[in-house]
Each structure stands twice: as C-alpha cells, then as structure tokens.
Amino acid sequence: AEWRAQPPTNPLSPDPLPWRVTLHHTDGRYTMSLAESLEETRFIQDFHQNGRKWSDIAYHYVVDAAGNIIEARPLETLGAHTLNNNEGNVGIVLLGRYHAPRNDQTTAPQLAAVATLGRFLVKRFGLEPASLKGHRDYKQTDCPGDLAYPKLPELRAAFGVPSKRLATVEAVDWDGQRARNSAASPSATR
C-alpha cells in the first residue's frame, strides 16, 4: 500500500461497535520523531505478522512521546491486543517501555493525544470513559507499565471532557501525512 505498511495477511474480522478501550505499551523503542515512530510501527507490524503470525498489527492506534497518533489496524475491525477480550475493544499503544528497568516517562503531548482519541471514541461510539482499562486489568502483565498505568484515572477524566475540536481526530497515516478521521466517516487512511 502507499503508506508502506503491509496489507493484512488474512481478512480482518469486523468489529464495528467498540465499547471499551485498552491502553498498552510496546516494551520497545521510545521515539520522539515522526520518522522514528513510523519506522517502529512498521517494525511492530512486521513482528506481529511474521513473528506471531497474526493478520495485522494488533493495535488500532499507536501514540509516540511527541503526541503523534498513528492509525494502525482499521478502527472498525477486531483487534488482537488483549487475549480473549478483543471484541468491542479499541487498542491504543504507547511506544516505549513505561516500566523498570528502563522507565520511559509519559509526556504531556502523549497523554493529550490519548485523551483526544478517547474523547473522539466517546463522541463517535458513546463509550463510557470508565471503559478505559490497562492491559494488566485483563491478564497478569506489566503492560502498560508502572509509569503509564497510574495515568488511567486522569485519562478517564479527560475522555469525558467535551471539546469543540472533536468533530475530527487528526491521525498520521504511514507516509507521515495527516489524515482526518471524522465522526461522520471514522475510517482515516492508514
């Protein structure tokens, strides 16, 4: 495809009505530039498709420390990020390791980007802000890390704050171009 990611290896299952959100961390590179973040997202997709033999990257959105939002798996499809809990579940992943021994730090732009995504999902699908969970709420794992997990109450509160700007969410497609994901048309170009 023109955005330099691989197409899904198999058809993705539809999941058109999300009702919850799960926050993850990649446990990988902590990136600050859009170019590095796109490269890391392609690496994750390659690992998921060729290493884990999944159809596509597991997550719907990737967020870097600079606050860039990268659309990954199409929003209207079933994710592969929370074993036995993917139905109706939007996966948002932070690039980096927010846990010992590295302890990458969350940033204000990154948290603002997650909050923007959350408000968009609340407005578009009627999600309850309380539906935001960390991966560790579903299984025994460090994810999304001891430094990101405590941010969940703050993010839940931000999900519920109305914003005039939320008619659309601006995400970055994989060429680094800005793609608008509107409430009327939730499919931004990957």
Task: Please annotate each region the language model reported.
Residues 1-26, 65-190:
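Basic/polar, cationic surfaces and motifs that engage anionic cell-wall
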Residues 13-75:
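Secreted/periplasmic proteins that engage bacterial cell-wall peptidoglycan
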